[in-house]
Amino acid sequence: MKPMRAWAARLILAASVSGPSLAADTFDLVSESEATAWNSLQPKEAKDFSTRDLREDDSAPTCHSTPDNDADNPQIRILAPPLGRPLTAPLDMDIQFVPTGSARIRPDTFLVCYVGLVTMDLTKRITDRVTVSEKGLHVTGAQLPRGRHHLLLLIADQRGRLGRREAVLDIY
C-alpha cells in the first residue's frame, strides 16, 4: 500500500508543477524597456494635436486627438482597476463606453495610448486579445513594470464626437 501512496503523491506533485501557469495568461501591455525608453527619450519633433472632424471619411482618432469639450461627447468609464491607489501587475481592466443621445459608439475608433515623453499607440496589444464592443471591453493579464504609467483612452461615436479618459496606473 505504501508504494501506491508514494506513487500517487508523486503524480499529484507532478500535475501541480506542470499545471497551467498564471504567466501563460498574461501579456506585456508595456515592457520595462519600453517604459524606460518612452519616458526618457526626447521626441524628434513636436506632434500636432488635432480636433479634426471624425465624421469625415469614417476617420478614427489618433493618440494626439483632442475632444472639443462638448458635454455631449461619449464617456469612458474605468470600472477596474481602481485608480488612485497602488496596483500590482498583472492587471485586469474593465472599460465601459457610455454613449450620449442617439449616437452609437464606434468600437473601431477605440484607442489606447501610453503617454510619456514619447506617446505610443498600444491599441493593437489589446485588440489582438479582446473584442471591443459598443459597451466597452474587458482585458485580463495586462503586465506593466513597476512605476507610474499614464494611459490615454479615446473613443468616438457615429456623430464624430470624441470621448477621452486619462488613467494613471501606479504599479508596485
Labelled PLM ranges:
Residues 100-112:
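Solvent-exposed loop/turn segments flanking beta-strands in beta-repeat/beta-sandwich domains
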Residues 168-172:
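Short beta-strand edge segments in extracellular beta-sheet folds
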Residues 92-101:
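Short edge beta-strand/loop segments characteristic of extracellular beta-sandwich folds
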Residues 141-148:
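Surface-exposed, short loops/turns at beta-strand junctions within beta-sandwich domains
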Residues 24-92:
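Short, compositionally biased P/S/T/A/G/V-rich stretches that sit at domain boundaries
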Residues 130-138:
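Aromatic sugar-binding surface patches on proteins
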